[in-house]
């Protein structure tokens, strides 16, 4: 038994499973997905056991839309004796590469949170036992693989490992952010998470600097505009609804009560285009790609609202529209990242810019 374990938002297991099967086939790795609805977990069982390690190294987490975390698993330890849960877990880790960190985790769900205290409690003796067997280094080392023990419940654990170059450094693969009280809506967290995920830290000072000009399509009441203003940008907020008064009082926002699909910026100095309009994903994708292809902006972050069924297929259709639009305008190569963020719901967030 060997394969890839992947975390996702509860309810999106089928979408992640479809995506993983397709991506694995592109790497000539074959198997089948195993999932339970609303578990937040997908197990891709490899037909060839050695392929699990290959996937952990070569299937980039950053390219998976619906996955929050991934690791190669070797065993599912079931019906663990409450008097000795650690023994079977150790046996499942014997052939792991030397690991520099242990993560004991659970699902991001009501059931998962019920065992979070148990996971914290067992972490200390489990870490000591792994170090005693030299599976884990005496001190944490971030350059070595991570040992994962994922508890489905208090008597069932999946054991595996991931590589530091291809995993999420966040607990459960979740970047948790604090809602700023002065922000006009919770949607502000989506753009904040997108900026932190898509823009490397060493480049944020330049690409998210004060003084840049931005356009926010579908801006009201101003959740996304808030993130731009907070960073010192000047924003054209496009929407027929009402904007937050505090944002308007900053002097950094020009309100444009117009249709986002028809809006044209006054000047050719827009760096960022952001968009969280509730519209068909195909329409939004074409609009965003047109702005990028015609160089009306340099970078864009936008959301694609998804249908209840065939969400992965809907995303692929939208991305194909983007590719066709860029090709039609002969705009050249471009960088594209897509992720189902923690703060997203029935939507995914896209970052895009020309590769100059």
UniProtKB/Swiss-Prot annotation:
Query: Which keywords does this chain's UniProt record carry?
Result: Cytoplasm, Methyltransferase, rRNA processing, S-adenosyl-L-methionine, Transferase
Q: Where in the cell is it found?
A: Cytoplasm
InterPro entries (UniProt xref): RlmM_FDX (IPR040739), RlmM_THUMP-like (IPR048646), RNA_MeTrfase_FtsJ_dom (IPR002877), rRNA_MeTrfase_M (IPR011224), SAM-dependent_MTases_sf (IPR029063)
Primary location group: cytoplasm
Which processes are annotated in GO (biological process)? Answer: methylation; rRNA processing
Its Gene Ontology cellular component terms are:
cytoplasm
Cysteines engaged in disulfide bonds, as pairs: none
The reaction(s) annotated as catalysed by this protein in its Swiss-Prot or TrEMBL entry are:
cytidine(2498) in 23S rRNA + S-adenosyl-L-methionine = 2'-O-methylcytidine(2498) in 23S rRNA + S-adenosyl-L-homocysteine + H(+)
Top-level taxon: Bacteria
**EC number from the UniProt entry:** 2.1.1.186
SUPFAM superfamilies xrefs: S-adenosyl-L-methionine-dependent methyltransferases (SSF53335)
Pfam families, per this entry? Answer: FtsJ, RlmM_FDX, RLMM_N
In which residues is S-adenosyl-L-methionine bound?
A: 187, 220-223, 239, 259, 276
UniProt-annotated catalytic positions: 305 (proton acceptor)
Q: Name one GO molecular function term.
A: S-adenosylmethionine-dependent methyltransferase activity
Q: How does it assemble?
A: Monomer.
- Read off the PANTHER family from this record: RIBOSOMAL RNA LARGE SUBUNIT METHYLTRANSFERASE M, RIBOSOMAL RNA METHYLTRANSFERASE FTSJ DOMAIN-CONTAINING PROTEIN
Entries under HAMAP family matching the protein: 23SrRNA_methyltr_M (MF_01551)
General function of this protein: Catalyzes the 2'-O-methylation at nucleotide C2498 in 23S rRNA.
Family statement drawn from the similarity comment of this UniProt entry: Belongs to the class I-like SAM-binding methyltransferase superfamily. RNA methyltransferase RlmE family. RlmM subfamily.
Protein's name in the database? Ribosomal RNA large subunit methyltransferase M
- Protein's organism: Pseudoalteromonas atlantica (strain T6c / ATCC BAA-1087)
């Amino acid at each position: 038994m060997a394969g890839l374990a992947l975390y996702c938002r509860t309810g999106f297991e089928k979408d992640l499973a479809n995506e993983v099967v397709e991506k694995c086939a592109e790497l000539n790795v074959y198997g089948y997905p195993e999932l339970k609805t609303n578990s937040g977990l997908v197990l891709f069982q490899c037909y060839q056991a050695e392929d699990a390690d290959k996937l952990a190294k070569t299937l980039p987490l950053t390219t998976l839309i619906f996955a929050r975390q991934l690791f190669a698993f070797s065993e599912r330890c079931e019906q663990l004796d409450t008097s000795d849960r650690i023994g079977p877990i150790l046996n499942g880790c014997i052939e792991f590469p030397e690991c520099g960190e242990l993560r004991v985790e659970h699902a991001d769900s009501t059931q998962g949170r019920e065992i979070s205290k148990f996971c914290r409690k067992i972490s200390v003796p489990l870490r000591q036992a792994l170090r005693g067997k030299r599976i884990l280094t005496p001190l944490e080392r971030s350059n070595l693989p991570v040992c994962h023990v994922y508890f489905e419940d208090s008597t069932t654990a999946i054991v595996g490992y991931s590589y530091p170059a291809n995993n999420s450094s966040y607990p459960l693969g979740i970047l948790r952010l604090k809602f700023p009280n002065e922000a006009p809506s919770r949607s502000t967290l989506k753009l904040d998470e997108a900026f932190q995920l898509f823009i490397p830290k060493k480049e944020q000072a330049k690409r998210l600097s004060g003084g840049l000009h931005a356009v926010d399509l579908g801006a009201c009441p101003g959740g996304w505009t808030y993130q731009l203003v907070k960073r010192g940008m000047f924003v054209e907020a496009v929407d027929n609804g009402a904007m937050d008064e505090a944002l308007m009082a900053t002097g950094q926002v020009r309100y444009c009560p117009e249709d986002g699909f028809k809006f044209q910026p006054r000047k050719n100095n827009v760096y960022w285009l952001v968009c969280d309009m509730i519209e068909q994903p195909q329409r939004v994708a074409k609009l965003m790609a047109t702005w990028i292809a015609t160089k009306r902006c340099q970078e864009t972050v936008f959301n694609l609202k998804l249908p209840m069924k065939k969400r992965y297929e809907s995303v692929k259709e939208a991305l194909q529209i983007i590719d066709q639009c860029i090709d039609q305008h002969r705009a050249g190569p471009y960088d594209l990242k897509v992720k189902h963020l923690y703060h997203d719901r029935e939507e995914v967030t896209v970052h895009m810019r020309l590769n100059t």
